[in-house]
From Swiss-Prot:
This is Cobalt-precorrin-5B C(1)-methyltransferase. It comes from Geobacter sp. (strain M21). Pathway: Cofactor biosynthesis; adenosylcobalamin biosynthesis; cob(II)yrinate a,c-diamide from sirohydrochlorin (anaerobic route): step 6/10. GO terms for molecular function: cobalt-precorrin-5B C1-methyltransferase activity. Belongs to the CbiD family. InterPro entries: CbiD, CbiD_sf. NCBIfam families: cbiD, PRK00075.1-1. HAMAP family: CbiD (MF_00787). One of its GO terms (biological process) is methylation. It catalyses: Co-precorrin-5B + S-adenosyl-L-methionine = Co-precorrin-6A + S-adenosyl-L-homocysteine. Transmembrane segments: none annotated. Keywords: Cobalamin biosynthesis, Methyltransferase, S-adenosyl-L-methionine, Transferase.
Length: 356
Protein backbone atom coordinates (compact mmCIF):
# COMPACT_ATOMS: atom_id res chain seq x y z
CA UNK A 1 0.00 0.00 0.00
CA UNK A 2 1.19 3.49 -0.80
CA UNK A 3 -0.17 5.05 2.37
CA UNK A 4 -1.64 7.93 0.38
CA UNK A 5 -4.43 9.67 2.26
CA UNK A 6 -7.65 9.54 0.25
CA UNK A 7 -9.45 12.81 -0.53
CA UNK A 8 -12.98 13.51 0.57
CA UNK A 9 -15.42 14.86 -2.02
CA UNK A 10 -18.72 16.73 -2.09
CA UNK A 11 -22.26 15.47 -2.54
CA UNK A 12 -24.55 16.54 -5.37
CA UNK A 13 -26.57 18.35 -2.71
CA UNK A 14 -23.59 20.44 -1.60
CA UNK A 15 -22.68 21.27 -5.20
CA UNK A 16 -26.27 22.26 -6.01
CA UNK A 17 -26.44 24.50 -2.93
CA UNK A 18 -23.14 26.13 -3.90
CA UNK A 19 -24.37 26.80 -7.44
CA UNK A 20 -27.63 28.20 -6.06
CA UNK A 21 -25.71 30.52 -3.73
CA UNK A 22 -23.59 31.77 -6.61
CA UNK A 23 -26.61 32.35 -8.86
CA UNK A 24 -28.43 34.14 -6.03
CA UNK A 25 -25.45 36.44 -5.43
CA UNK A 26 -25.27 37.18 -9.16
CA UNK A 27 -28.93 38.19 -9.15
CA UNK A 28 -28.54 40.32 -6.04
CA UNK A 29 -25.34 42.12 -7.06
CA UNK A 30 -25.73 41.98 -10.84
CA UNK A 31 -22.12 40.83 -11.04
CA UNK A 32 -20.26 37.62 -11.82
CA UNK A 33 -19.26 35.25 -9.03
CA UNK A 34 -16.16 33.07 -9.32
CA UNK A 35 -16.19 31.32 -5.95
CA UNK A 36 -18.55 30.77 -3.04
CA UNK A 37 -18.07 29.53 0.49
CA UNK A 38 -20.59 27.13 1.94
CA UNK A 39 -21.07 25.78 5.45
CA UNK A 40 -21.87 22.09 5.07
CA UNK A 41 -24.33 20.22 7.33
CA UNK A 42 -21.40 18.33 8.90
CA UNK A 43 -20.08 21.65 10.21
CA UNK A 44 -17.20 22.01 7.75
CA UNK A 45 -16.77 25.10 5.58
CA UNK A 46 -15.88 24.55 1.92
CA UNK A 47 -15.08 26.71 -1.11
CA UNK A 48 -16.53 25.93 -4.55
CA UNK A 49 -15.32 27.26 -7.89
CA UNK A 50 -18.13 28.68 -10.03
CA UNK A 51 -18.15 28.32 -13.81
CA UNK A 52 -20.14 29.49 -16.82
CA UNK A 53 -21.73 32.53 -15.25
CA UNK A 54 -24.37 34.30 -17.37
CA UNK A 55 -26.45 37.36 -16.38
CA UNK A 56 -29.48 38.27 -18.43
CA UNK A 57 -32.26 40.63 -17.30
CA UNK A 58 -33.75 39.04 -14.18
CA UNK A 59 -32.01 35.70 -14.55
CA UNK A 60 -28.59 34.33 -13.65
CA UNK A 61 -27.06 30.96 -14.39
CA UNK A 62 -23.85 29.13 -13.51
CA UNK A 63 -22.57 25.69 -12.61
CA UNK A 64 -20.34 23.87 -10.15
CA UNK A 65 -18.34 20.79 -11.14
CA UNK A 66 -18.81 17.94 -8.71
CA UNK A 67 -15.58 16.68 -7.17
CA UNK A 68 -16.15 13.30 -5.53
CA UNK A 69 -12.61 13.18 -4.20
CA UNK A 70 -11.17 9.68 -4.35
CA UNK A 71 -14.58 8.02 -4.17
CA UNK A 72 -15.49 6.06 -7.36
CA UNK A 73 -18.72 8.01 -7.83
CA UNK A 74 -20.43 7.98 -11.24
CA UNK A 75 -21.30 11.66 -10.78
CA UNK A 76 -17.67 12.73 -10.34
CA UNK A 77 -17.01 15.57 -12.80
CA UNK A 78 -20.70 16.18 -13.46
CA UNK A 79 -21.75 19.79 -13.97
CA UNK A 80 -24.46 20.88 -11.52
CA UNK A 81 -26.18 23.79 -13.30
CA UNK A 82 -28.51 26.32 -11.71
CA UNK A 83 -30.63 28.97 -13.37
CA UNK A 84 -32.04 31.56 -10.99
CA UNK A 85 -34.83 33.98 -11.83
CA UNK A 86 -36.62 36.70 -9.91
CA UNK A 87 -40.13 38.01 -10.39
CA UNK A 88 -40.72 41.28 -8.55
CA UNK A 89 -43.82 42.51 -6.76
CA UNK A 90 -45.30 39.06 -6.23
CA UNK A 91 -45.61 37.06 -3.03
CA UNK A 92 -42.38 36.26 -1.21
CA UNK A 93 -41.60 32.71 -2.25
CA UNK A 94 -38.61 30.49 -2.99
CA UNK A 95 -39.19 27.79 -5.59
CA UNK A 96 -36.77 24.90 -6.16
CA UNK A 97 -37.29 22.97 -9.37
CA UNK A 98 -35.59 20.23 -11.34
CA UNK A 99 -34.60 20.49 -14.96
CA UNK A 100 -32.77 18.39 -17.52
CA UNK A 101 -31.05 15.38 -15.97
CA UNK A 102 -32.83 15.55 -12.61
CA UNK A 103 -35.08 12.60 -11.85
CA UNK A 104 -38.67 12.51 -10.69
CA UNK A 105 -39.97 10.17 -8.00
CA UNK A 106 -42.57 7.67 -9.25
CA UNK A 107 -42.75 5.18 -6.37
CA UNK A 108 -43.68 5.63 -2.70
CA UNK A 109 -41.36 4.96 0.20
CA UNK A 110 -38.65 7.55 -0.47
CA UNK A 111 -37.86 10.75 1.42
CA UNK A 112 -39.47 12.72 -1.43
CA UNK A 113 -43.17 12.31 -2.35
CA UNK A 114 -44.32 10.71 -5.59
CA UNK A 115 -44.36 13.22 -8.44
CA UNK A 116 -41.75 15.51 -6.91
CA UNK A 117 -38.27 16.22 -8.21
CA UNK A 118 -35.64 13.93 -6.67
CA UNK A 119 -34.14 16.67 -4.51
CA UNK A 120 -33.79 15.23 -1.03
CA UNK A 121 -34.77 17.07 2.17
CA UNK A 122 -31.27 18.00 3.41
CA UNK A 123 -30.10 19.51 0.08
CA UNK A 124 -33.43 21.31 -0.22
CA UNK A 125 -32.96 22.73 3.26
CA UNK A 126 -29.38 23.77 2.41
CA UNK A 127 -30.62 25.57 -0.70
CA UNK A 128 -33.33 27.44 1.20
CA UNK A 129 -30.80 28.51 3.84
CA UNK A 130 -28.28 29.92 1.36
CA UNK A 131 -31.00 31.82 -0.53
CA UNK A 132 -32.26 33.37 2.71
CA UNK A 133 -28.66 34.22 3.63
CA UNK A 134 -28.01 35.99 0.32
CA UNK A 135 -31.26 37.97 0.32
CA UNK A 136 -31.43 38.56 4.09
CA UNK A 137 -31.52 42.37 3.81
CA UNK A 138 -33.83 42.61 0.80
CA UNK A 139 -37.46 43.29 1.63
CA UNK A 140 -38.79 43.78 -1.91
CA UNK A 141 -41.67 41.31 -2.51
CA UNK A 142 -40.42 38.80 -5.05
CA UNK A 143 -40.61 35.17 -6.13
CA UNK A 144 -37.23 33.50 -6.53
CA UNK A 145 -37.05 30.37 -8.68
CA UNK A 146 -34.01 28.09 -8.84
CA UNK A 147 -33.92 25.39 -11.50
CA UNK A 148 -31.27 22.68 -11.05
CA UNK A 149 -30.08 20.59 -13.98
CA UNK A 150 -27.32 18.13 -14.89
CA UNK A 151 -26.76 18.07 -18.67
CA UNK A 152 -25.81 14.37 -18.86
CA UNK A 153 -27.77 13.36 -15.78
CA UNK A 154 -30.19 11.03 -17.54
CA UNK A 155 -27.32 9.05 -19.06
CA UNK A 156 -25.39 8.93 -15.77
CA UNK A 157 -28.52 7.75 -13.95
CA UNK A 158 -28.45 4.53 -15.97
CA UNK A 159 -25.33 3.59 -14.00
CA UNK A 160 -27.11 4.03 -10.66
CA UNK A 161 -30.01 2.27 -8.93
CA UNK A 162 -32.34 5.24 -9.46
CA UNK A 163 -34.62 3.48 -11.92
CA UNK A 164 -35.08 0.56 -9.56
CA UNK A 165 -36.05 2.99 -6.78
CA UNK A 166 -38.60 4.59 -9.09
CA UNK A 167 -36.60 7.73 -9.86
CA UNK A 168 -36.90 8.30 -13.59
CA UNK A 169 -35.38 10.77 -16.01
CA UNK A 170 -32.15 11.55 -14.24
CA UNK A 171 -30.10 11.76 -11.08
CA UNK A 172 -31.01 12.65 -7.53
CA UNK A 173 -29.73 15.62 -5.55
CA UNK A 174 -28.49 13.83 -2.45
CA UNK A 175 -26.45 14.10 0.71
CA UNK A 176 -26.92 14.45 4.44
CA UNK A 177 -23.49 15.75 5.47
CA UNK A 178 -22.36 17.52 2.31
CA UNK A 179 -19.24 15.39 1.97
CA UNK A 180 -18.50 12.05 0.33
CA UNK A 181 -16.11 9.77 2.17
CA UNK A 182 -13.71 8.00 -0.20
CA UNK A 183 -14.53 4.37 -0.93
CA UNK A 184 -17.36 4.68 1.55
CA UNK A 185 -20.03 2.06 2.12
CA UNK A 186 -22.56 4.70 3.15
CA UNK A 187 -23.86 5.34 -0.36
CA UNK A 188 -24.56 1.63 -0.72
CA UNK A 189 -26.20 1.20 2.69
CA UNK A 190 -28.30 4.33 2.10
CA UNK A 191 -29.53 2.69 -1.11
CA UNK A 192 -30.31 -0.53 0.76
CA UNK A 193 -32.44 1.45 3.23
CA UNK A 194 -34.22 3.31 0.44
CA UNK A 195 -34.82 0.09 -1.52
CA UNK A 196 -36.37 -1.63 1.50
CA UNK A 197 -38.59 1.41 2.12
CA UNK A 198 -39.78 1.33 -1.49
CA UNK A 199 -40.41 -2.43 -1.34
CA UNK A 200 -42.60 -2.06 1.74
CA UNK A 201 -44.42 0.98 0.37
CA UNK A 202 -45.23 -1.04 -2.76
CA UNK A 203 -46.74 -3.82 -0.67
CA UNK A 204 -43.92 -6.37 -0.66
CA UNK A 205 -44.16 -8.99 2.09
CA UNK A 206 -40.98 -10.78 1.04
CA UNK A 207 -37.73 -8.95 0.29
CA UNK A 208 -34.95 -10.65 -1.66
CA UNK A 209 -31.46 -9.59 -0.55
CA UNK A 210 -29.05 -10.41 -3.36
CA UNK A 211 -25.27 -10.38 -3.05
CA UNK A 212 -24.86 -9.52 -6.74
CA UNK A 213 -26.60 -9.09 -10.05
CA UNK A 214 -26.08 -12.72 -11.15
CA UNK A 215 -27.78 -14.13 -8.07
CA UNK A 216 -30.52 -11.53 -8.34
CA UNK A 217 -31.29 -12.61 -11.92
CA UNK A 218 -31.63 -16.23 -10.76
CA UNK A 219 -33.97 -15.16 -7.96
CA UNK A 220 -36.07 -13.08 -10.36
CA UNK A 221 -36.49 -16.09 -12.63
CA UNK A 222 -37.73 -18.33 -9.84
CA UNK A 223 -39.76 -15.98 -7.64
CA UNK A 224 -42.98 -14.29 -8.71
CA UNK A 225 -42.37 -11.02 -6.92
CA UNK A 226 -42.59 -7.38 -7.97
CA UNK A 227 -39.36 -5.72 -9.08
CA UNK A 228 -39.39 -3.56 -5.96
CA UNK A 229 -39.01 -6.68 -3.79
CA UNK A 230 -35.46 -7.30 -5.05
CA UNK A 231 -32.80 -5.40 -3.11
CA UNK A 232 -29.12 -5.43 -4.07
CA UNK A 233 -27.30 -5.71 -0.75
CA UNK A 234 -23.86 -6.40 -2.24
CA UNK A 235 -21.40 -7.20 0.54
CA UNK A 236 -23.55 -5.61 3.26
CA UNK A 237 -25.35 -8.70 4.55
CA UNK A 238 -25.52 -7.73 8.22
CA UNK A 239 -26.63 -4.17 7.49
CA UNK A 240 -29.29 -5.30 5.02
CA UNK A 241 -30.70 -7.89 7.42
CA UNK A 242 -30.96 -5.36 10.25
CA UNK A 243 -32.49 -2.79 7.91
CA UNK A 244 -35.21 -5.25 6.93
CA UNK A 245 -35.79 -6.31 10.53
CA UNK A 246 -36.00 -2.76 11.86
CA UNK A 247 -38.49 -1.78 9.16
CA UNK A 248 -40.73 -4.78 9.84
CA UNK A 249 -40.13 -6.91 6.75
CA UNK A 250 -41.95 -10.23 7.40
CA UNK A 251 -39.64 -12.45 5.32
CA UNK A 252 -36.31 -12.21 3.53
CA UNK A 253 -34.67 -14.41 0.94
CA UNK A 254 -30.87 -14.27 0.99
CA UNK A 255 -29.74 -14.98 -2.58
CA UNK A 256 -26.10 -15.51 -3.44
CA UNK A 257 -23.52 -17.66 -5.11
CA UNK A 258 -21.59 -20.29 -3.17
CA UNK A 259 -18.52 -18.25 -2.21
CA UNK A 260 -20.60 -15.42 -0.74
CA UNK A 261 -22.87 -17.82 1.13
CA UNK A 262 -19.82 -19.54 2.64
CA UNK A 263 -18.65 -16.16 3.97
CA UNK A 264 -22.09 -15.48 5.45
CA UNK A 265 -22.15 -19.00 6.92
CA UNK A 266 -18.83 -18.18 8.61
CA UNK A 267 -20.45 -15.19 10.30
CA UNK A 268 -19.10 -12.39 8.10
CA UNK A 269 -21.68 -9.61 8.19
CA UNK A 270 -19.55 -7.76 5.62
CA UNK A 271 -18.59 -10.28 2.92
CA UNK A 272 -15.92 -8.20 1.19
CA UNK A 273 -13.14 -9.78 3.20
CA UNK A 274 -9.99 -11.65 2.28
CA UNK A 275 -10.19 -14.54 4.72
CA UNK A 276 -10.96 -17.17 2.08
CA UNK A 277 -8.61 -19.81 3.47
CA UNK A 278 -9.93 -19.30 7.00
CA UNK A 279 -13.46 -19.76 5.64
CA UNK A 280 -12.49 -23.01 3.95
CA UNK A 281 -10.82 -24.23 7.14
CA UNK A 282 -14.00 -23.54 9.10
CA UNK A 283 -16.03 -25.28 6.42
CA UNK A 284 -13.69 -28.28 6.63
CA UNK A 285 -14.44 -28.62 10.35
CA UNK A 286 -18.18 -28.53 9.70
CA UNK A 287 -17.84 -31.14 6.97
CA UNK A 288 -15.92 -33.38 9.35
CA UNK A 289 -18.73 -33.28 11.92
CA UNK A 290 -21.41 -34.49 9.48
CA UNK A 291 -21.17 -38.14 8.35
CA UNK A 292 -22.63 -37.35 4.93
CA UNK A 293 -19.88 -34.81 4.22
CA UNK A 294 -16.90 -36.09 6.23
CA UNK A 295 -15.23 -37.36 3.06
CA UNK A 296 -15.10 -33.76 1.77
CA UNK A 297 -13.02 -32.42 4.67
CA UNK A 298 -9.65 -32.86 3.01
CA UNK A 299 -11.00 -31.56 -0.28
CA UNK A 300 -12.06 -28.35 1.51
CA UNK A 301 -8.62 -27.93 3.07
CA UNK A 302 -6.92 -28.32 -0.31
CA UNK A 303 -9.35 -26.24 -2.37
CA UNK A 304 -8.14 -22.92 -3.76
CA UNK A 305 -11.53 -21.25 -3.39
CA UNK A 306 -15.06 -22.02 -2.25
CA UNK A 307 -16.13 -22.29 -5.88
CA UNK A 308 -13.29 -24.75 -6.50
CA UNK A 309 -14.60 -26.92 -3.64
CA UNK A 310 -18.17 -26.80 -4.94
CA UNK A 311 -17.16 -27.86 -8.43
CA UNK A 312 -14.63 -30.47 -7.25
CA UNK A 313 -17.30 -32.04 -5.04
CA UNK A 314 -19.57 -32.49 -8.03
CA UNK A 315 -22.04 -30.01 -6.52
CA UNK A 316 -22.49 -32.33 -3.56
CA UNK A 317 -26.02 -31.98 -2.18
CA UNK A 318 -25.01 -32.51 1.45
CA UNK A 319 -22.30 -29.84 1.13
CA UNK A 320 -24.78 -27.36 -0.31
CA UNK A 321 -27.38 -28.09 2.37
CA UNK A 322 -24.77 -27.77 5.12
CA UNK A 323 -23.66 -24.32 3.97
CA UNK A 324 -27.22 -23.07 3.47
CA UNK A 325 -28.27 -24.35 6.90
CA UNK A 326 -25.36 -22.42 8.40
CA UNK A 327 -26.49 -19.29 6.56
CA UNK A 328 -29.97 -19.71 8.05
CA UNK A 329 -28.44 -20.01 11.51
CA UNK A 330 -26.53 -16.76 11.01
CA UNK A 331 -29.73 -15.08 9.76
CA UNK A 332 -31.50 -16.22 12.93
CA UNK A 333 -28.67 -14.82 15.05
CA UNK A 334 -28.75 -11.44 13.29
CA UNK A 335 -32.55 -11.06 13.15
CA UNK A 336 -34.25 -13.81 15.18
CA UNK A 337 -37.75 -12.37 14.79
CA UNK A 338 -37.68 -12.34 10.97
CA UNK A 339 -38.33 -15.37 8.76
CA UNK A 340 -35.46 -16.13 6.38
CA UNK A 341 -34.87 -18.43 3.44
CA UNK A 342 -31.71 -19.06 1.42
CA UNK A 343 -31.33 -19.32 -2.34
CA UNK A 344 -28.08 -20.62 -3.82
CA UNK A 345 -27.50 -19.36 -7.35
CA UNK A 346 -25.18 -21.32 -9.61
CA UNK A 347 -22.29 -19.78 -11.51
CA UNK A 348 -24.03 -20.43 -14.82
CA UNK A 349 -27.40 -18.84 -14.10
CA UNK A 350 -29.00 -21.95 -12.60
CA UNK A 351 -30.74 -22.49 -9.26
CA UNK A 352 -28.83 -24.94 -7.06
CA UNK A 353 -30.84 -24.78 -3.85
CA UNK A 354 -33.77 -22.97 -2.25
CA UNK A 355 -34.53 -23.65 1.39
CA UNK A 356 -38.15 -24.47 2.25
Amino acid sequence: MSGKELRYGFTTGACAAAAVKAAAQMLRDQAMVREVELMLPCGIGANFQVHGGVLRDNTASCYVVKDAGDDPDVTNGAEIHVTASIEFFTKNEIKIEGGTGIGRVTKPGLAVPVGAWAINPVPRSMILEVVKEVFALRCIPATLTFSISIPNGEELAKRTLNERLGIVGGLSILGTTGIVKPISAKAWTDTVDASVDVALACGARTVVLATGRSSEIVAQKHLSLSEEAFVMMGDHFGYAMRSCASKGVPEVVVAGQFAKLVKIACGHEQTHVTSSQMDLDALAWWLREVPATAHLEQMAREANTARHLLEASGYNKALIELVCSRVLKVCADVAPWMKARVMLAGYHGDLLYFSP
